[in-house]
C-alpha cells in the first residue's frame, strides 16, 4: 500500500496488512504452551493412596449395616391386580365400615352455630 512515488504509506494501511497475521495468532490453541506436569503432585500421590485406602475401609464398615428382614413385614403372596372386598376385610377384623363416619360427626363443631349464639346476646 505504499505509494512508490512518495514512499509514504496511507494511514491504516499497515494495520490492515497486519490484521491477517494477528487474526491467525489468536484463537483456540494459540496460547503459549504450558507445562502440565507438576512435580509436587507426584510426591503427594503416595500420601493420597494411603488416605484413600483408609477411607475405603471406613466406608466398607458403614455399608455393611445390613439388618435382618422382619418376616412379619413380608407378604405371603402377590397383591398386585388383586380384587379386594373391603366389606369382607372389615368383617374379618370385626370392624364396621360406618363406625368411622359416626365418630367424626360427634367431634364436629359448627362455626355458624356459635355465631348465631353470639348474635342472640
UniProtKB/Swiss-Prot annotation:
Q: Which Pfam families match?
A: CHZ (PF09649)
Bias class Acidic residues marks the residues at 40-70, 97-121
This protein's GO cellular component annotations are: nucleus
> Keywords assigned by UniProt?
Chaperone, Nucleus
Location, primary (coarse class): nucleus
The highest taxon in the source lineage is Eukaryota
Segments for region (Disordered):
1-121
The keyword Transcription belongs to this UniProt entry's keyword annotation: no
Where is this gene product found?
Nucleus
InterPro entries, per database record: Histone_chaperone_domain_CHZ (IPR019098)
Q: Which SMART domains match?
A: CHZ
Q: Where would you find the membrane-spanning parts of this chain?
A: none
> Member of which family?
Belongs to the CHZ1 family.
Q: How does it assemble?
A: Forms a heterotrimer with H2A.Z-H2B, stabilizing the association of the histone dimer. Also, with a lower affinity, forms a heterotrimer with H2A-H2B.
Q: State what this protein does.
A: Forms a chaperone-bound H2A.Z-H2B complex that acts as a source for SWR1 complex-dependent H2A to H2A.Z histone replacement in chromatin.
Record's protein name: Histone H2A.Z-specific chaperone CHZ1
Q: Origin organism of this chain?
A: Pyricularia oryzae (strain 70-15 / ATCC MYA-4617 / FGSC 8958)
Gene it is expressed from: CHZ1
